[in-house]
Amino acid sequence: MSELKNDRYLRALAKQPVDVTPVWMMRQAGRYLPEYRATRAQAGDFMSLCRNAELACEVTLQPLRRYPLDAAILFSDILTIPDAMGLGLYFETGEGPKFERPISSLSDVKKIPKLDPNDDLGYVMNAVSTIRRELKGEVPLIGFSGSPWTLATYMVEGGSSKVFGKIKKMAFAEPQTLHLLLDKLADSVIDYLNAQIKAGAQSLMVFDSWGGVLSPRDYNEFSLQYMHKIVDGLIREYDGRRVPVTLFTKNGGQWIEAIAATGCDAIGLDWTINISDAKRRVGDKVALQGNMDPSMLHGTPERIRQEVATILEDFGTGNGHVFNLGHGITPDVDPENAGVFINAVHEFSAKYHK
């Protein structure tokens, strides 16, 4: 495989010196780009796009053709694992993902098959290897998965939720059922991410989108301990390089010390925590990723540049910062504003790396 031409992102995750702060965007391959919308229309629907390695590669590379990004992220979905477990994933227009056969009992959990990622999720591995080849060493490729808790919320709720009533009922009325599900999911995530590494992923991210709906005690019990298990089970060196892992819990700012203690390389931050506060609290244990509010991309170019400058100033000098949004870029953002954001990070950060 080609030698990396731009390893800023991996160096920042290792808290090594860089010339400028690296930047990428969650959901950088997405509906805000007209070329993405055209490719998705060609695929027919979202999961067909995910399952076609050439088209998944195409949409992964699209933002890199537009912007000087420092990393590519696999185009896929966090729900590939429960889909492969036979829950019948489908998408309803305007309502997001749903499952035909949600999990509601211990017997449902016991029936969940053990996955072989190279077989049951072979289309993801094909996409990873295709993207890695087509990147030609320009930037590193990030692989990812949802966290066990976040995957379980969709599997038990049967789709997206605002109140999480079903999974919280299971957590408190049948905790042993939920723990069995979370344990199975943790094992599946470990196998899935390790397969992505072998297919070509050079860094990993675990998205705990819904960890923030839990109380501190319940977060430790139902989310964090399973992410800790994942970190312990991952391949940490491959092809002569460390494979860093970033954990991202949305609304998880109150728990960053505990997240840092898992042994992860970096913590993803949303916009509800000040990055200077996060840096003070975790010290040099981990790198930090984030954390501009994605809604800021609706601001004027001047306002976007001002926010980038403020966050860089808040982080200050020192290594270990990957600039990102605090969550995914939204479909209604002007692509020009995304370019303003990315260019501002490189322009304003150089003075912090002299």
Swiss-Prot record:
It catalyses: uroporphyrinogen III + 4 H(+) = coproporphyrinogen III + 4 CO2. NCBIfam families: hemE (TIGR01464). PANTHER family: METHYLTETRAHYDROFOLATE:HOMOCYSTEINE METHYLTRANSFERASE RELATED, UROPORPHYRINOGEN DECARBOXYLASE. Keywords: Cytoplasm, Decarboxylase, Lyase, Porphyrin biosynthesis. GO terms for molecular function: uroporphyrinogen decarboxylase activity. Pathway: Porphyrin-containing compound metabolism; protoporphyrin-IX biosynthesis; coproporphyrinogen-III from 5-aminolevulinate: step 4/4. GO terms for cellular component: cytosol. Belongs to the uroporphyrinogen decarboxylase family. The gene is hemE. HAMAP family: URO_D. Gene3D superfamilies: 3.20.20.210. The keyword Cytoplasm applies. This is Uroporphyrinogen decarboxylase.
